[in-house]
Amino acid sequence: EILSGRTQDKNLSYLATWLNEIGIQLTEVRVIRDEEDEIVDTVNLLRKKYDYVFTTGGIGPTHDDITSESIAKAFNADLETNPQALAILKEYYKDSELTEARLKMTKIPKGAELVENPVSKAPGFKIENVFVMAGIPKIMQGMLEGAKIHLSGGKPMKSESIDVFMPESFIAEELSNL
């Protein structure tokens, strides 16, 4: 949806700011297609390269939400109904509302831990150093608090913007001395 231009990304800026506030510097960002092999290959590459990997999107109830299956494949783990996720959705939805599509959101790779979703209840999950969260910005933002207990960062990066009203080239030398 982002690659097609139909949806504008709102998660990246929020995630980068949030990570900086807890002392974790965002190093690389990728936007990839909803294609299993691409997700598997990308996750396998990045999880070895970085302390933490965050994915957003692809864990909902529709046919093209394939992130959970792809993450399971990346970790060579079975995708199974998580009893805790099922209990959460059973408590949140009436029986008539708990459709097969919604039950898809209870399928988590074996060995993964749930990441709480205080907004719409369907949880994300964490497996090793990979955090898998919803793509809807409000839901993803809520899930970050549940992920926070698994993260350790350094000192928060502080920054401040100032308006200078002159070309960058005029102050480039001074900036390089900072």
Predicted segments with their positions:
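Short glycine-rich or small-residue beta-strand-to-loop segments that form or flank ligand, phosphate
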Residues: 1, 52-57, 130-133
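Short glycine-rich anion-binding loops that position phosphate/pyrophosphate groups of nucleotides
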Residues: 1-2, 58-61, 137-139
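N-terminal small/polar loop signature for handling phosphorylated ligands or for N-terminal nucleophile
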Residues: 16-66, 72-73
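Proline/glycine-rich low-complexity loops and linkers
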Residues: 38-41, 66-154
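Flexible, glycine/charged-enriched surface loops at secondary-structure junctions
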Residues: 28-29, 99, 156-161
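Short amphipathic alpha-helix segments
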Residues: 166-178
